Structure formats: C-alpha cells, structure tokens
Design a protein with these regions (language model features):
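Residue-level recognition of well-ordered beta-strand positions that form the cores
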Residues: 93, 105, 116-120, 135, ...
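Bacterial N-terminal signal peptides
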Residues: 7-17
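Positively charged n-region of N-terminal signal peptides that target proteins for export
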Residues: 1-5
Length: 295
C-alpha cells in the first residue's frame, strides 16, 4: 500500500463509526431461540437475554376470584413446528385440552418481535379459552434483583409504565391496589374486558387507555415495550415480569380468531414509541378510557 494513502484510509474507517455520521455500525438483529415453553430473545441492543414464558397459561373467564390452577388454567401442550437457523423466526403450535389449536408465527427483526397468532376451534363444542399469558422476564434488561420480585412495589416496577388517559404513567400508580386472592402484583383491566376475567392479583381501579406498556433499561437509555391486539390486561407480575396478555374471548365450534402483537426494543424516546405503536395498532390509537365493565 502507498504510505501516502494511509491517512485517508484511517480517516475513512473512523468515519464509519463516528456517532451521527449516518454510516454507523449497526447492531446485530434480534434473535429468537426456543427451549421447552420458553423463548429467549438476544442480539440487537439488548444488554442481556430476555426470557419469555410463551405461553405461560391459557385462561377461562371468571379468573379474578377463582382458584388459578384448578379453575382458570386450561392445560395445553406446545410444539415447535419450524425455526429458522438464523433465529429470525419460529412457529409454535399449542393444543389446548379442549381441542382448540393456537398457532404462533413469531418473527424477530432489527428492533422488534412480531407476533401473528391464529386461534381456531375445530371441535363441535364451544371453548372457554378467553385469554392467554406471555410472561416477559425483565430482570436483566432492568438490572433488577429477582429476590426483590415479591415486594409490594419491587424496585423494577418503578421503571415500568403504561398509558392512562393517553399519558405515559410510571408505576407505582396511585392508588396502588393491595387486596386480592393472590398477592402482590398489579393488574390493569381495560374498559372492554369484564373485571371478573383478569389475573387474580390486586386489581387497580385505573383503566388503561391502550395496551402499550413497557420498562426502561437499567441505564435509562432504552425501552422494552409490549402490545397485543386484542388485549385482556396489563399485569406487573411477581417474578420480575411484565405482561400484556392477549384476548381470545372464547371460540364457538369451527370459529377462528386472529391476534397480533409486538415487542419493541427501542431508544428511550417515548413520543417516537407511541407514534410507532399507533401506526402498528390503529385500533388503540389515543383511545380514551371509557367506563370499565362492572364486576
């Protein structure tokens, strides 16, 4: 190489990684792997792996006040149908004990995970499958100690948010519910869902105006956010987790329903996140919280 060219080469290489140059080195895409009933999300700008219990449970109505294991949960079996070698997509099929089949196509992209879900009832009996729980574990993203998860308001909850009357609202919300069949935790029931049909943890009187919820990273520079359409509840859980649980609403014989969802891993710009969410979920865009359904 001509020595006179060396300074120009060094300058060009530096230009590739100069912040704001428009030619920055890009983060690797997000990647999905699956083991048993757990998805693991890695890559991108994540500070560490994010584990998702997918699906933790399929649930019957009446769940707010009844025994979780014996009355609410519908047993199911889960099978991996396909997985791309590069971790960009997995297809999962869940078969519920009443015969309902739920197929999930889950695609990882640069800064999001997309969920396309089809629930169908091939039987001649109506199914009570009303909602389902993807449980997103956030301890590594939030820099949280899992030992604190059973606190009344665990430290990681203070990094969490949802939207009330269209405004980002940080937890703990006021008032903070404390009474329920099981404690602790905090459940937020949207106006379109019967308040008898959510998680049997403390139920907030506050009504979310959309399903968008999330958490700030330990350094405050990123947001991991969740959304499904339709959704059943938002739940700050008891294992350093956050839920935006999706709604099925029961299935008549031969009926099929579609659900879609997103996980976003984005810079901590709340306005950009909300704008993107409203493009992806126009059904929930700036939807005012109406009166909740009566218990």
């Amino acid at each position: 190489m001509n020595p006179r060219c060396l300074p120009f080469l060094v300058f060009a290489l530096l230009g590739l990684v100069t912040p704001g140059s428009g030619a920055e080195v890009q983060a690797t895409p997000l990647r999905l792997t699956r083991e048993r009933t757990f998805l693991t999300l890695t890559g991108g700008t994540l500070p560490g792996p994010v584990t998702i219990h997918y699906i933790e449970a399929y649930c019957r109505p009446g769940s707010t006040h009844q025994d979780w294991r014996t009355e609410t949960v519908i047993p199911h079996q889960s099978a991996l149908i396909a997985a791309r070698p590069d971790g960009s997509e997995v297809v999962i099929r869940d078969t519920l004990s009443d015969g309902v089949v739920v197929e999930h196509t889950i695609t990882a992209r640069a800064d999001e995970v997309d969920f396309q879900i089809v629930a169908r009832n091939p039987t001649e009996r109506e199914s009570p499958a009303h909602w389902a729980q993807p449980c997103v574990r956030l301890d590594r993203f939030a820099g949280a100690n899992k030992a604190d998860a059973q606190s009344l308001v665990p430290p990681y909850a203070r990094q969490c948010f949802l939207f009330i009357d269209g405004q980002m609202t940080r937890l703990p919300t006021e008032p903070w519910a404390t009474e329920a069949r099981y404690q602790p935790g905090q459940v937020y029931c949207p106006a379109h869902v019967n308040r008898n049909d959510v998680n049997p943890r403390p139920l907030s009187p506050l009504v979310p105006s959309s399903g968008l919820c999330g958490i700030y990273s330990a350094d405050g520079r990123q947001i991991l956010a969740l959304a499904f359409e339709p959704y059943q509840e938002i739940f700050q859980g008891v294992i350093t987790c956050l839920h935006n649980d999706f709604r099925i609403g029961g299935l008549k014989p031969g009926e099929s329903k579609t659900i879609r969802g997103k996980i976003y891993v984005v810079p901590a710009d709340a306005k950009k996140l909300l704008d993107r969410f409203e493009r992806d979920f126009p059904e929930q865009a700036r939807r005012p919280a109406s009166r909740p359904q009566k218990s």
